[in-house]
Amino acid sequence: MPTALTHEYRVRKNFGKIHKIIDIPNLIQMQKESYELFLQRDVPSEARSERGLQEVFKSVFPIEDFSGTASLEFVQYSFGEVKYEVEECLARGMTYEAPVKIVVRLVVYDVDKEAGTRSIRDIKEQEIYFGTLPLMTDNGTFIINGTERVIVSQLHRSPGIFFDHDRGKTHSSGKILYSARIIPLRGSWLDLEFDPKDILYIRIDRRRKFPVTVLLKALGYATEELLNYFYPSEKIFLKSEAQSEKELNPDILMGSRAPEDILHPQTGEVLIKKNRKLGKQALRRLQEVGINRLPMKSTELIGQVLAQDVIDYGTGEIVAECNDSIDADMLKEFVERGVGEIELLHLEGQDVSPSFRNTLLMDKVNTQEDALIEIYRRLRPSNPPTLEVATEFFNNLFFNPDHYDLSEVGRLKLNLQLGLEVPLDYRTLRKDDILMAVRQLIRLKDSQGPVDDIDNLGNRRVRAVGELLENQYRIGLVRMERAIKERMTLQEVEALMPHDLINAKPVSAVVKEFFGTSQLSQFMDQTNPLSEITHKRRLSALGPGGLTRERAGFEVRDVHPTHYGRICPIETPEGPNIGLIVSLSTYARVNPYGFIETPYRKVDGSSARKDVSYLTAMDEKEYPIAQANAPLDEKGRFLLDLVSARVAGEPVMVPPNEIRYMDVSPNQLVSVSASLIPFLEHDDANRALMGSNMQRQAVPLIQTRAPLVGTGIERIVAKDSGVAIVARRTGVVEYVDATRIVIRAIEDNGEMGSGVDIYKLIKFQRSNQNTCINQKPLVQHGDLVTKGQIIADGPSTDHGELALGRNVMVAFMSWGGYNFEDSILVSERIGKEDVFTSIHIEEFEVVARDTKLGKEDITRDIPNVGEEALKNLDESGIIRVGAYIKPNDILVGKVTPKGESQLTPEEKLLRAIFGEKASDVKDTSLRVPPGVEGIIIDAKVFSRKGVEKDERTKTIEDQEISRLMKDQRDELEIIFKSTVKRLAKLLENQVSDSAIKDGKKVYIKKGEVFTEEILLNLPSGHWDQLTVAKDPTVSMEIENILANYREQVQLVKSLFEEKIGKLKRGDELPPGVIKMVKVYVAVKRKLQVGDKMAGRHGNKGVVSRILPAEDMPYFPDGTPVDIVLNPLGVPSRMNVGQVLETHIGWAAKGIGMQLAQMLEECRERETMNEKLQRIYNKLEFGTYFKDASERELRGLIPDFKEGIHVASPVFDGAEEAEIRAFLSEAGVSETGQSVLYDGRTGMPFDQPVTVGVMYMLKLHHLVDDKIHARSIGPYSLVTQQPLGGKAQFGGQRLGEMEVWTMEAYGAAYALQEFLTVKSDDVAGRTRMYEKIVKGDNTLEAGLPESFNVLVKELQALALDVRLLEEEEGN
């Protein structure tokens, strides 16, 4: 049984002190889960939940015609089989998609208009093809037209209600104006806002504002009802014109002053003197002595507002209306008419203002009908309003699910903000919602309370792939719905079938547009595995329904306290998108409502538990949360009396018993990229940002090496990115080579199963960024592998760990000015040993079309091309694999027919003599573009169905078939062997009941005991003759085993035949294309001057010189350093992490060399163990080394020679004392410095130099991709100057400043040449060419074309510019 040492492949010494609580969730889970929930592809139709596609179909169907005579109902949807697998789609330029079929039911009714009823006349059900939907690959990407794309998740403002104010910026007085906004997922926005006069207005869809009371009246509320809802009322008992009494209401009277002395009813003593403040105690005393009314002067009532209509019950007449102000005459009339009591609105007091009453006074609309018509008139000014139309329009605005959808999230936010308990599936507005929103806003204004923060992650949510596509699909279905309704009306429905009504084109078009051109559908960044993973975990605030770069301010872009553990504060692009495009943190996940959650350990009674809760930003705001590095004892109790914690994002010191939660890990704060940077805690944030961004640009190298100094999550990134191959089941490796691994699976009960897993390795495939994707097996024949084990490395992975660069020996010192301004001095050894060499793959494509003049042909027979140029082409005209090519070489020979041109008499004569017909085609071969040099690694040919295949196609087809045959053979052999094993186990010690023979050959004699060897030699065709003496049950079991075997064999064969059939069928090509050839060229790029390199701490630079190894500074033992960096690049950048990495890297290298030496010298195991125990902690030593055999340890020698691997987790890394101890263990100076000698003179440098091992990356900005040279090339049409840029094969611009330098040197003729014949003097160019041919090198400059352009521009401005030609001699 292999030990953990061989199983894990790589042991890392971990400097972290904090134990792992939970595993990091799968890094691309968000993408995959979202799309699975959208499709619900593997869920039976009756069990599908109301979300994604199901919800869209249910919300649009049933579709009824305008008269109600027919209805089209949705029954279910299903997916068909995928036509092409992922690899085929990538090769052929197809989309990886599955057809969608829907079952719909057309119900036709008989309508009885008089009775108002309808009865079913006819029901027709039919399955209809409904276009296709792209499927997601296992790695969370989509393949659209042969390219891998990623749908980036969008971070947008959550639907719901938000309260805000203008911070005093709107009005000149600086008064704070409060506002509220109800945002639905779909439908009209509702804005409530105060003006400077405290009148409350409302806007619908940002149109003209009108008083909020108009809307409330349209909802059916009366004036009196509204006033009593917003204001408390108090009863007044009128005695006379001079004296009255008011009811004792503690809620209203609290804090007011006594109008007169208040006397005890029995004793007559003064309880409360006049003008004394009425507090809680005073009011309670009054109630205790039985005082229910307080005396007041009637004159105090003047100016107060009535809460109800005042009615003279004698006559039934309304004396005064609700909301009227009382004046002296009115008061007199009340007394005269004998009105005993009135109710007044309480408008003055704490947190109460008359703003709503003032709004009502301003509002001239009195009835609900008027209000509805007023709203209709405001929103539809051009349409004539009628009450019926206005009512329907108003109801559709907020109360019709077809037009308005708050979404579950919107309802959730509304319930939380307004304190409601409405079910989440109630997704339109209610009357109460609007009323309560108005009341909440008025309360907020009166109390000057806090408003919502729109940048809080509780108010922003993530829309992942599923939801984005769901919204698009709905748009397509709504377009289709209109067309269906029109068809139902125009045609006789009885005669129609469902397929006559449904046309899926609008839906397909919307889906195609979304995947092809949406801002959120992006070409995947596939430079290396990390760039893939970060692209899938990216969140963008841009895109449809989001922000735009120009409008986004600082607040949206800034880091917010709620980002903690949810969004990385470091990883974001530099430039205009900073802060708008962010990355999900390591442990973060998105909940069903789209809010980002982060995990916390629960804390009970000041001790941390092992179980974890996921909290959103809204959930965590009231809890104190401790940090992951808070000191705990073995039982999880806090050691300190005051613990550093966060409450609502603010740092505080809290006693342990108050803490409710604790972070799970120090790196939960940052994203995957940032958590790959060791000693991140010692880097300045700006440099950490560059470091995490530049790791994504690292090019995969030929020889991958994991970093000596890592952080411990390299393995997780490699596994989750999908570039490394992970074993699907436990099993034994039966066969392994560079292109495939065959594993025989072991059943769960430990028995050898008959299952076979064949893993095909990707060999030298081109990525989106032209880097090379190549997989290498890590297992050997006979190895036992467990489920989830990494069995093959991909690009930029080393033994299942992410490996973006190389560990190199660096020195921080200046060297001859070659590391000025971040330049990097590199040793020649790096080029010789291919340390930073990478392979880049270019794809070239040529298409033969059927043109109007005839068919283009791919052929070796090309006019006017010598045999030398054709030497590498095969008989089909396609270059052979392995050929070395240079610019302008022919890759694929192609000729195109050209139109018959008028022949000269000479040509006619030649034609007549030689009968030559070759000149009617022209050479349009695919040639190598400038700047590309490399080796052909593959050529793929696609021919249209029905076109005869050429030799090359047949050869490629034969190779593919033989590969498939090999797979089939292996699979059948494993099934055969495992069946034999099962039979042998069943027939152990059993005796054959009869002889089995084939002709004269006897396989088993009668009475012979069965053995595995006998059964292996027995052909499977004779297995049904196996019989056992005395045991009929065994025969039954044999029958079952045989049936199982035949079934598996049949399955394998049918799959194989299907694949071969697919191969032999012609290819689907675009219209007019006969044949398409793709040629792949591998270009090997060594590190050279001008290439950009970087460390992981934002320390980037350009290679300035490659120096012979013997000239590089060297150690006292003669070892030269590999790279010399500028020490001035550290202090001002404040990325000290690189220095600590260098120190610990040096120690790791030294210790590794010591261990390798000890193993080579075969030291005693005791000594070896002591050394290992000093380096590794108890757990690591116990797990990996304690039980390892001598052979296993010796197998680590090559690894140890490069150094031992260490992990310094983010925010929990190695401390200074540990680094010092590590350096002294390695036997080097604790200062991390060494004396270096100058390679040129052999003299030591004056001072010791900081040296060590740093992990360096080669970035994608390669000089070969940027540099080019132009001799003769294309010119711009208008100015006739050479084009610019490498893509256009342009020249360098000689601009204004360059002209000044030439003038300064007085180089007039050189300058004249630059500005005329070498640039845009067309006639002069031609003359110059002729002169050079004749051997005359004199210059005769003419008029530059740009001067003519200037003249034409001036003429366009109506200036009459003419050139006056002077005659010579005047």
Curated annotation (Swiss-Prot):
Similarity remark: Belongs to the RNA polymerase beta chain family.
HAMAP family noted in UniProt: RNApol_bact_RpoB (MF_01321)
GO CC list: DNA-directed RNA polymerase complex
Quaternary structure, from the entry: The RNAP catalytic core consists of 2 alpha, 1 beta, 1 beta' and 1 omega subunit. When a sigma factor is associated with the core the holoenzyme is formed, which can initiate transcription.
Presence of keyword Transcription: yes
PANTHER family named among the record's database cross-references: DNA-DIRECTED RNA POLYMERASE I SUBUNIT 2
Name of the protein this chain belongs to: DNA-directed RNA polymerase subunit beta
Highest taxon in the source lineage: Bacteria
Its job: DNA-dependent RNA polymerase catalyzes the transcription of DNA into RNA using the four ribonucleoside triphosphates as substrates.
Reaction catalyzed: RNA(n) + a ribonucleoside 5'-triphosphate = RNA(n+1) + diphosphate
The UniProt record lists the keyword Manganese: no
PROSITE patterns in UniProt: RNA_POL_BETA
Organism encoding this protein: Syntrophobacter fumaroxidans (strain DSM 10017 / MPOB)
E.C. no: 2.7.7.6
GO BP annotations listed: DNA-templated transcription
InterPro entries: DNA-dir_RNA_pol_bsu_ext_1_sf, DNA-dir_RNA_pol_bsu_external_1, DNA-dir_RNA_pol_su2, DNA-dir_RNAP_su2_dom, DNA-dir_RNAP_su2_hyb_sf, RNA_pol_bsu_bac, RNA_pol_bsu_CS, RNA_pol_bsu_protrusion
Listed Pfam families: RNA_pol_Rpb2_1 (PF04563), RNA_pol_Rpb2_2 (PF04561), RNA_pol_Rpb2_3 (PF04565), RNA_pol_Rpb2_45 (PF10385), RNA_pol_Rpb2_6 (PF00562), RNA_pol_Rpb2_7 (PF04560)
Organismal lineage: Bacteria, Pseudomonadati, Thermodesulfobacteriota, Syntrophobacteria, Syntrophobacterales
Alphabetic keyword roster: DNA-directed RNA polymerase, Nucleotidyltransferase, Transcription, Transferase
A GO MF term: DNA-directed RNA polymerase activity
Name of the coding gene: rpoB
